[in-house]
UniProtKB/Swiss-Prot annotation:
GO molecular function annotations of the record: nickel cation binding; urease activity
NCBIfam families according to UniProt: PRK13241.1, urease_gam
Enzyme Commission numbers on file: 3.5.1.5
GO terms for cellular component: cytoplasm
Protein name: Urease subunit gamma
């Protein structure tokens, strides 16, 4: 199977998000890369489901809370930008202050 660099990036991100979900389910607090991966995967899957950019920008702020991440992580992530594939093409989704 041949994958483009973009497809490899998406696969790596999705794998990191799965690890983050499992750690969260075990009650562990997420670190920076796990937090970014989980929120980014949520946005990518929402786009695939046909949600709007505006709804993903809002919903992306409620994926994680401060109690679910390690100390200092929310301050390290002022914004998350994800280029997601929607039914009508690729769009950039920006989530400001994603961990509240």
């Amino acid at each position: 199977m041949e994958l483009t660099p973009r497809e490899k990036d998406k696969l790596l991100l999705f794998t990191a998000a799965l690890v983050a979900e499992r750690r969260l389910a075990r009650g562990l607090k997420l670190n920076y890369p796990e937090s970014v991966a989980l929120i980014s995967a949520f946005i990518m899957e929402g786009a695939r489901d046909g949600k709007s950019v505006a709804s993903l920008m809002e919903e992306g702020r409620h994926v994680l809370t401060r109690k679910q991440v390690m100390e200092g992580v929310p301050e390290m992530i002022p914004d998350i930008q994800v280029e997601a594939t929607f039914p009508d093409g690729s769009k950039l989704v920006t989530v400001h202050n994603p961990i509240i």
